[in-house]
């Protein structure tokens, strides 16, 4: 029996690559939208590559033809190239939803962010939640997947640990269970055949910020030195950024510094361990020539 055709938007991104590989390994006919086909690093008999840009609706005509499910990881961390969060996280995904409806797509799966409903006052979450509202009112069957954060989002802990000391706001007791992209991809693909409308998901182990700082220092074989900064410093930095910089600059920092002052803990899932990820990152960095290592850490 031939499997359903799935469309992946955002397939060249970190999570999108894992989702595409997972779909292909499960035998799904997989169509991916890319701006530059040359960026695709893998091939498969079931892989269909379509050149299009989700921010330009005229390039999406019939992109969803014969597709049963659309999976979108489209979104930006930093606003660049003249594009805002509203342009990409909301409008580009809304373009896809409109095209999906025209072509009779049955289900739309969107990867958002944990606690986005509580963080609508942040620019990035405002756009993601507006898209979530649009999807819910679209008439399509849908699932909104809300990950707690990726292992790769913990990179700042490693950067500080390399210098021998990790700085945290507050007492470091807020909880988070970040997830590896491969584990999240499996969970996303599983939603194709279940009827859950929203899923909060994180990695297999819950950590405090102190725990993560200790793991990062251990990865560098450094003594555990954690400095706890008073939370008013975090609040002042947020105020300063909003007052004296534009949203293009402060958007990603605004989200990061707000999320660091709340629990970002979700249903545990997966098998990858953060400590293994940290050790691999450190080992890989040590294998690089000095100039390449400096570039990687920027």
Where are these regions (language model features)?
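Substrate-positioning beta->alpha
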Residues: 170-192, 197
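N-terminal Rossmann NAD(P)H-binding glycine-rich loop of SDR-like oxidoreductase domains
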Residues: 4-26
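Glycine/proline-rich active-site loop of Rossmann-fold NAD(P)-dependent oxidoreductases
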Residues: 152-159, 190-199, 222-224
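Non-catalytic, hydrophobic alpha-helical segments
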Residues: 15, 70, 184, 188, ...
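Glycine-/Pro-rich loop/turn segments that contact NAD(P) or position catalytic residues
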Residues: 76, 80-162
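A hydrophobic C-terminal alpha-helical subdomain
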Residues: 231-298
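NAD(P)H-binding glycine-rich loop region in Rossmannoid oxidoreductase-like domains
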Residues: 7, 38-95, 99-102, 115-117
């Amino acid at each position: 029996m031939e499997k359903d055709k799935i469309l992946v938007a955002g397939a060249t991104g970190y999570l999108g690559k894992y989702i595409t590989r997972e779909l292909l390994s499960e035998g799904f006919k997989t169509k991916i939208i890319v701006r530059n086909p040359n960026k695709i690093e893998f091939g498969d008999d079931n892989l269909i590559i379509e050149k299009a840009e989700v921010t330009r609706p005229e390039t999406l005509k019939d992109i969803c033809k014969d597709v049963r499910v659309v999976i979108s990881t489209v979104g930006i961390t930093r606003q660049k190239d003249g594009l805002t969060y509203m342009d990409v996280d909301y409008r580009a995904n809304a373009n896809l939803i409109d095209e999906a409806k025209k072509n009779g797509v049955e289900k739309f799966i969107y990867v958002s962010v944990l606690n986005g409903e509580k963080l609508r006052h942040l620019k990035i979450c405002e756009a993601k939640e507006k898209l979530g509202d649009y999807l819910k009112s679209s008439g399509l069957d849908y699932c909104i997947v809300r990950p707690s954060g990726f292992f790769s989002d913990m990179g700042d802990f490693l950067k500080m640990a390399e210098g021998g000391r990790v700085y945290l706001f507050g007492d470091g007791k807020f909880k988070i269970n970040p997830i590896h992209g491969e584990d999240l991809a499996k969970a996303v693909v599983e939603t194709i055949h279940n009827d859950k409308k929203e899923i909060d998901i994180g990695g297999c182990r819950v950590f405090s910020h102190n725990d993560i700082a200790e793991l990062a220092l251990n990865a560098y074989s450094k003594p555990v030195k954690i400095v706890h900064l008073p939370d008013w410093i975090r609040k002042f930095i947020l105020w300063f950024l909003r007052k004296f910089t534009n949203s293009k600059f402060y958007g990603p920092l605004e989200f990061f510094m707000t999320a660091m002052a709340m629990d970002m803990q979700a249903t545990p899932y997966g098998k990858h361990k953060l400590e293994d990820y940290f050790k691999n990152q450190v080992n890989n960095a040590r294998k690089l020539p000095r100039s390449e290592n400096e570039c990687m850490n920027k």
